[in-house]
């Protein structure tokens, strides 16, 4: 849970969302924390999309918007477990 306090603001506000394996490798968080990030996107997908788009407009977050959209489509198509593994 301690890792999630650091990851959620970075992912949500900073627009640095990447796939779960990249989260674990780049940010040094557990697989559990990465799965929680995927769950947060799945639960609040509209909010995540809005944040990603605003970040894209503000500067440089276009990749983030694409990754969030990809994650959302993977969740719909294959489920949250596959998306977390991606």
From Swiss-Prot:
It comes from Enterococcus thailandicus. It comes from the Bacteria. One of its GO terms (biological process) is defense response to bacterium. It is found in: Secreted. The keyword Secreted applies. There is a cross-link at residues 23-86 (Cyclopeptide (Leu-Trp)). Cyclopeptide antibiotic with bacteriolytic activity against the Gram-positive bacteria S.aureus and S.thermophilus, and lower activity against the Gram-negative bacteria E.coli and P.aeruginosa. Gene3D superfamilies: Bacteriocin AS-48 (1.20.225.10). The keyword Secreted applies. One of its GO terms (cellular component) is extracellular region. Pfam families: Bacteriocin_IId. InterPro entries: Bacteriocin_AS48, Circ_bacteriocin. This is Bacteriocin thailandicin. Keywords: Antibiotic, Antimicrobial, Bacteriocin, Secreted. Its main location: secreted.
